[in-house]
Amino acid sequence: MFILVAISIDANDNRRHVHVFYKGKRHQHSLAKIWIEANGQQCVEIAESSLSAKDNEMLVAAINRHWEFINEQVTKAFNGEKTISIDIEK
């Protein structure tokens, strides 16, 4: 349904975040930007979104459940390392 992406050029933003895209679409634009931390601590919040409230709630809950893995992948992306992806249940 969705794919979360850490974009390495965003490494200097003031808060770590992921961008949300529809999975499998060719011409994509970010549907949402979700912060995953504040001051180095887990804090998942919608920064901006064109998704429904239901989708936003589902994404925030999923990111909270898998925060350690997602944060690790963001670190790897920002360091230019290979990242891996997993399917996450709603």
Predicted region positions:
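Well-ordered alpha/beta subsegment
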Residues: 48-89
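Betabetaalpha-Me/HNH-type nuclease active-site subdomain
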Residues: 1-12
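A short, structured beta-strand/loop element
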Residues: 10-54
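Generic hydrophobic secondary-structure signal
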Residues: 4-6, 18-20, 34-36, 59, ...
